[in-house]
Amino acid sequence: ENDVFAKSMTEREGCPSFVFYEGPPSANGMPGIHHVMARTIKDTFCRYKTMKGFQVKRKAGWDTHGLPVELGVEKALHITKEDIGKTISVAEYNAACRKDVMKFTKEWTDLTHKMGYWVDLENPYITYDNRYIETLWWLLKQLYNKGLLYKGYTIQPYSPAAGTGLSSHELNQPGCYRDVKDTTVVGQFKMKNPKPEMAEWGTPYFLAWTTTPWTLPSNTALCVGPKIDYVAVQTYNGYTGEKMTVVLAKALLYTHFNKKAEELALEDYKPGDKLIPFKVVGEYKGPDLVGMEYEQLIPWVKPVTVDENGKWQEAAGEAFRVIPGDYVTTEDGTGIVHIAPTFGADDAFVARAAGIPSLFMINKKGETRPMVDLTGKFYLLDELDEAFVKKCVDVEKYKEYQGRWVKNAYDPQFTVDGKYDEKAAAAAESLDIYICMMMKAANKAFKIEKHVHNYPHCWRTDKPVLYYPLDSWFIRSTACKDRMIELNKTINWKPESTGTGRFGKWLENLNDWNLSRSRYWGTPLPIWRTEDNSEEICIGSVEELYNEIEKSVAAGFMKSNPYKDKGFVPGEYNGENYDKIDLHRPYVDDIILVSKDGKPMKREADLIDVWFDSGAMPYAQIHYPFENKELLDSHQVYPADFIAEGVDQTRGWFFTLHAIATMVFDSTAYKAVISNGLVLDKNGNKMSKRLGNAVDPFSTIEKYGSDPLRWYMITNSSPWDNLKFDTDG
């Protein structure tokens, strides 16, 4: 009430500045006790620097785009992504998102005041603001002009539940990789032209293990390690009793065969015997097996090749052979990897290098698609091209599996009113089980068992992701990897181990940044392209877009300039002027531009990764470079002297700040950073509303007061260590 915070600003006018950046929370969710922890650390340093004579400006911010908002609105409206544009217009949906994203602003403001956190809530930066978006467009144009923005068709993490691709830093948020128990199978791939010693005892097979049996119908190759030793083994199938000779890695022989059975005679075996005899009859190096052919394991669909014009034809014998791959190991499995190029980045890489086709479907639009659609189920027959079905699909075999969800988590019956029943999904029989049972009945399964393995999940839906071929826009962050590593060494990390370890190792293993998001509420990608993709333009400002629209009007592609119609004046940067327009979908999608050759250009439909929004805040919060250019260029507001957030931001906000600063400005975005630990319950478990162990910050402050709470949080453990929160002390 005495406006002390504002006075601390005015009384330090003209003093040296201490630059601090506030990471933007999303106001569509309630604040938690962990926010008190992070804000206590931030407030402590900022107040200390103020007392030491510095002016410490602290602009609040709101993160307003992206999956958290969209999924919340879908739940509230009882719709799915597929309903948008059908039962509800994009304009109506985005209006609901804009309203929903700020619904807990009052509670956030209330907590800010109650805990005594000094931050400027009167003039916050808001990521959905048109001026904020304009700065993002300017940054993207800088990347585009440097050749760091490109479009590629690659295998990417994809969340069927969220309906969009994910970046590697989203996939590496804490808790995204989880141990799951899945049905696995060692498949038997029947050889076509075996070596003589492989054909002397029963049917010859290659053995390959997979934790994702649903990908086996998309298999087009087997991969062996060039330096791995392999053996041919005469034995019997444990399920059917069939005589067989199998090939697998020598180092894994006793993983699949009981050493006690080594001395048993093959001829003495009787079906049902627990000990199955075996005999090694040949040894090979990986290259000895390369080029050998096998029969398609699950012949539902024949592979096709597609030319540059989109014309397809049945693949002429390139598939179903053994190829080499350096990444094959003998840590688990059989030392032979099943290759489904449409569902794995490594698979796609080695297949492409060896000239192996991917197994694609052709839909009614003539487009090539994987066997699984974007919702996570096998394509329905009536969604496919009739000629393709007639020539390449075994309808009798495939029809039983069409429309089946590859993971139960994607099946809508296990999500009611937006709540996913993970236990029910896990208890139900999965497609993997059905495929394994089908293989067992057809004598194509050597071993079926449950296996616990680490699998990635979507950071917002908590459901498993797929690796899926996507047409996406990427930032070529790998081109600047060495510079990012070099600049990271100049940052003062607390703890230092986070900078050199978690963050440093992340930079060393950097992938290109998947920027595209196939959603509705977010910053639109400012790239327009001709239909044949021969010409494109990247827009870097509203004024540039305004001028390009004028050219389009003159060319007859647009009736009028919607920005001019609304009275928008280019170059006037006040809020009143920018509130006349909306840079979001669907309005920006309605804009048709004209290419240099006079062709119409439509906007690429994607939005950009919401993490780019927050990583761009040093520039977008001041509408750089359209306003306040001198402030930033003279280093009055950039880089930050200090930032602080939870350790979960290491591969989130900390990374995107660093990446954008390096790639656009060849600098760091911050000089010092505290990465605080997690706030756990008193037993050391992660807090969760679902588990009922979350601590309400409002009632805690009401009962104990804000100063005791702040003191407890910063003195009970080092800021970077996890805190076991216990009100009993």
PLM regions: where:
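Short histidine-centered catalytic/ligand-binding loop motif
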Residues: 31, 380, 415-426, 492-500, ...
